[in-house]
Swiss-Prot record:
Any GO molecular function: glutamate 5-kinase activity
Protein name per the record: Glutamate 5-kinase
Record-stated family: Belongs to the glutamate 5-kinase family.
Upper classification of the organism: Archaea, Methanobacteriati, Methanobacteriota, Stenosarchaea group, Methanomicrobia
Binding site for ATP: K17, S185, D186
Gene Ontology terms: cellular component: cytosol
GO terms, biological process: L-proline biosynthetic process
Pfam family, one: AA_kinase
Listed EC numbers: 2.7.2.11
């Protein structure tokens, strides 16, 4: 078994970021200014995702290209400075992108879901929890989430924050506890100098630690349509590395590139994850200050210890006042055995304690979540050490 195969042996949740140049490159004319979506490329991605799904892996896509495609559709020259024009192009291009993604995945019997994000998803805790829960639910139903920045309503300079979604993909990967982020573009990986201007540039196959020297290899953006140069990709790798997520930067032109990367083939540049840092978000949950206590019965305790979610039927009592998104202690027979991030407030839990999931709506008048605490939001105390 090769080193990469060992690294990726337990990879389960994968985020795939696809750059503008990859989605449109084969659909460009000789001027490289008028670009259309490349349906064949999208079908290739859909096929590879379907194969990963057969292996039991979860896949999320972060797709760029809305502005570039929209500009072409509206007959506007590339990279206009006026933000309203770019926002309009994003609105037109995004709908076209989703139509083509839906068409590509439908050929393999899969459905897709559009998720448009702004920077607030990262800074607002409740919004972040909603994102996690939404993506988790979509994956449970076999739907492929396709994420993009909401350029149409962005109040900051479009793409200035996320850099053609490089940073966005890293933030998504880190927040949903992905094991691997694959960044596909029109470049083979990270070189020690710009390969487009230096024929002797050397490809780095592995980066064990992102040092100032590694960051200096970033250079300036080189892609004509996208805004995500190597510098933003290195920053994305840095975010993921600290969250315990591997990153591979590779060329989307490689046949079955996603499948080859996931199987451990040495393609592109691999940035190692700092697995000892936040390897399991449960450590953070366990060390966080609890806002209250949820008492559960023995059956619920056994389910939680067995890596299952906490259901309202197993809740016996609630102590303290807390909101959705707060960390609470889980207690059984007078002993605290776990902590978790609750999806319901203390007031709501008091009303639905002991209630079966299908009765939540009858009690509250609504049912946002089937679980009180999702399994990925639980930390078992005995696992801290």
């Amino acid at each position: 078994m090769t080193e990469r195969e060992q690294f990726f042996r337990d990879v389960n949740k994968i985020v795939i970021k696809i750059g503008t140049s990859s989605i449109t490159r084969k659909g460009c004319d000789h001027t490289r200014e008028n670009c259309n979506i490349d349906p064949a490329f999208m079908e290739s991605i859909a096929f590879q995702v379907s194969e990963l799904r057969k292996q039991g892996k979860e896949v999320i896509i972060v797709s760029s290209g809305a502005i570039g495609v929209g500009l072409n559709e509206l007959g506007i020259a590339p990279k206009p400075r006026e933000i309203p024009i770019r926002q309009a192009a994003a609105a037109v291009g995004q709908s076209m992108l989703m139509q083509d993604w839906s068409r590509a995945f439908s050929r393999y019997g899969m459905k897709v879901a559009q998720i448009l994000l702004t920077y607030e998803f990262y800074s607002d805790r409740v919004t972040y929890l909603n994102l996690r829960n939404s993506i988790s639910t979509l994956l449970e139903y076999g739907v492929v989430p396709i994420i993009n920045e909401n350029d149409c309503t962005c109040t900051n300079e479009i793409e200035a924050i996320f850099g053609d979604n490089d940073k966005l993909s890293a933030m998504v990967a880190s927040k949903i506890d992905a094991d691997l982020l694959i960044i596909l573009s029109d470049i083979d990986g990270l070189f020690d100098r710009n390969p487009k201007t230096h024929i002797d540039a050397k490809l780095l196959t592995i980066v064990k630690k992102i040092t100032p020297e590694i960051e200096s290899y970033g250079g300036d953006p080189t892609s004509f349509k996208g805004v995500g140069g190597m510098r933003t990709k290195i920053k994305a790798a840095k975010i993921c590395s600290m969250a315990g997520c591997y990153v591979v930067i590779a060329n989307s032109d490689v046949e079955d590139v996603i499948l080859k990367i996931a199987s451990g083939e040495e393609i592109g540049t691999l940035f190692l994850a700092e697995r000892h840092i936040q390897k399991n978000r449960a450590r953070w949950i366990i060390l966080a200050r609890a806002s209250g206590t949820v008492r559960v019965d023995a059956g619920a305790k056994a389910a939680v210890l067995g890596k299952n979610s906490l259901l309202p039927a197993g809740v016996v009592d609630v102590e303290g006042t807390f909101d959705r998104g707060d960390v609470v202690k889980l207690e059984c027979d007078g002993k605290i055995f776990a902590k978790g991030i609750t999806d319901y407030t203390s007031e709501e839990l008091i009303k639905i304690k002991g209630v079966h999931t299908d009765q939540i709506e009858n009690v509250l008048g609504y049912s946002n979540y089937n679980n009180v605490i999702k399994k990925e939001n639980i930390g078992i105390l005995e696992e801290l050490n």
